[in-house]
Amino acid sequence: MNTKNIFKTFFLCLSVFSLSFTLNAQELKPLRLGVAGVSHGHLHEVLIRLERGDFEIIGVAEPDEQLRVNNPLRKKVDSSLFYADLEEMLDKTKPEAVVAYGSIYDHLAIVEACAPRGIHVMVEKPLAVNMNHANRMARLARENNTLLLTNYETTWYDTNHEAYRLIKNEN
């Protein structure tokens, strides 16, 4: 899957709101998605979109044993795909992209683990705990030619997509 298709699929399957267009899952292979952390509330968005078929969860890394054992993904993802260690999950499952659903303090470590492996990352807002972390994450993404996305809710509003289309067509 080329970077353009990964980028398109990444944005589509990780949105927290429905987009104004759909992805023809028959044209693209499902995105191989890793999950880093299970404590963020947006994890439920992945759960309700699993059946669409445009992505598959191929690994879940959660260091906290209680969270690893007791989380909603356990009902939909095979228990053999859960790992205590992020790097082990990345090396064994080889995801194309990872969603960070843990602490903001973990965002830098997730990008440090993923970017050198060529794995794209989506983090929840805010991007980082400080500018040093944000700059390091941006540098890692640039140096490794990977996408780093911060999930801002308004990005997925249909009205914003329509406004962009109207402005683009006027110019």
Model-derived features: where do they sit?
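N-terminal Rossmann-like dinucleotide-binding module
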Residues: 21-77
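Short, well-ordered coil/turn segments that N-cap beta-strands
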Residues: 31, 55, 80, 119, ...
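Beta-loop-alpha module in the N-terminal Rossmann-like domain of NAD(P)-dependent dehydrogenases
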Residues: 77-140
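A contiguous active-site-proximal alpha/beta segment in oxidoreductase catalytic domains
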Residues: 128-171
